[in-house]
Amino acid sequence: MLTNPLAMKRPDWRDIAEQKMPKELRLAYELTALTDFRDARLEIQKNLRRSNQPFADALLAELYNSSGDSLLMTRSLRRAYPQLATVEQDTVPAYFLKMYYPIRYFDAIMKYSKQNGLDPYLMMGLIHQESFYNPLVRSPVGATGLMQLMPPTAKEIARRIHSSSNVEDPEVNIRLGTNYFRQLVNLFGGAVPLAIASYNAGQGNVLRWRRAAPHRPMDEFLESIPFPETRNYVKRVTMLSASYRRITR
């Protein structure tokens, strides 16, 4: 059975940078290792300005990750390693790449991607964008879970494939979400970029836009999408997919 290639092991921090850890951060490092998150955070914040900034932000990222705060973890990592937003991600220590690109339901993603004939790395990128692997996240309009499924959509797919519709269950959500994405791919004749766009903007909108420009090359069509959020969404999911493909091999 395939195992999660992003399983994380805490490194000896002396091995992830050329210079040694500043002495004012060593206590924070030890406190984080002991899961004393409150005191560790206070130590880091107290010494942040006078310490090595990337080290401090990286320690904060580990602290927030350990305490389940993915938003602050992401912000801290981006400060520590600005190259996370570029194509130079290979220069980021593997431990932090694994933190930035989590996969918490690897086996389910592989299983249901294969069942639906989908690229699992694309599904990893989509889940990252939709929920950052938080199975309980809910949008203001009611989209729920890892793949942010709307209740009517989830119920319709669940009825058709004889599945539970409990979208807060990670495996159920992935099963329903990958099935729904397969539907979108089929609807657009195998055009995955259009399926990604419709996952964000709705299939009705994308069908209407494509019918208005049926022969426009795909790259030009994607740039002409009238919703800025959807244009950026397609680019973001595509980039995340490529990142997951690269770091899991």
Identify the residue ranges that each predicted region occupies:
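Catalytic glycan-binding domains that act on GlcNAc-containing polysaccharides
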Residues: 1-18, 27, 39-249
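Short Lys/Arg-enriched alpha/beta "domain-start" segment
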Residues: 16, 33-34
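Primarily a LysM-type cell-wall glycan-binding module
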Residues: 21
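Active-site-adjacent segment of 2-oxoglutarate/Fe(II) JmjC oxygenases
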Residues: 30
